[in-house]
């Protein structure tokens, strides 16, 4: 059985042209037609994004199940990570990965019931800007009760790592979650208009085999967000 996964930092639907155009994000997600999307920087009731509940809006437009994990509260509204799934989401938890007084960060974990397969786990992370912060966050995530529980089923861990130098890959590889990008090179996703860094990554438990991995780069994705969406097709 093949399932497709996408991680995409949508930058609140605000493109590199500084315009809020959620219809561009909808167009991109619809054209990719993945089974599961892990989205970061998803606004809920924030003026800059027309007070939209973006996760609910995307869910309705795409006809998908969704769950939202809010991490950062603003004067009006909040934002965080969202998971959209073609299949029912049966459980979700938001893991707090905030280090000290740094910006609030989290990992949204969901169990998804896939027909003819059973449950899988999808964990959507958005890590910090400092190297020491990211290392602490990924170790805390791996050691969490939620992660220990969800790794009992086929698991995909994906999101915006902010890890330009691939320092987290050895830690995750040792934990049994190799990068789905086999050669660990190329496939840069940031900034979208001229990608120099591979910040957006997908890791999978050894239940999975990779059949395809790519960055979605076209005229629309170059402007819709400051990140490009990253896609993996996995076989189980």
Locations of regions flagged by a protein language model:
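Short active-site-adjacent helix-start/loop capping segments
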Residues: 45-48, 75-77
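Active-site regions of metal-assisted phosphoester/phosphodiester hydrolases
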Residues: 1-36, 60-61, 65-68, 72-236
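Short, flexible, glycine-rich and Lys/Arg-enriched loop motifs at helix boundaries
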Residues: 46-56
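Active-site neighborhood of divalent metal-dependent phosphoester/pyrophosphate hydrolases
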Residues: 13, 40-47
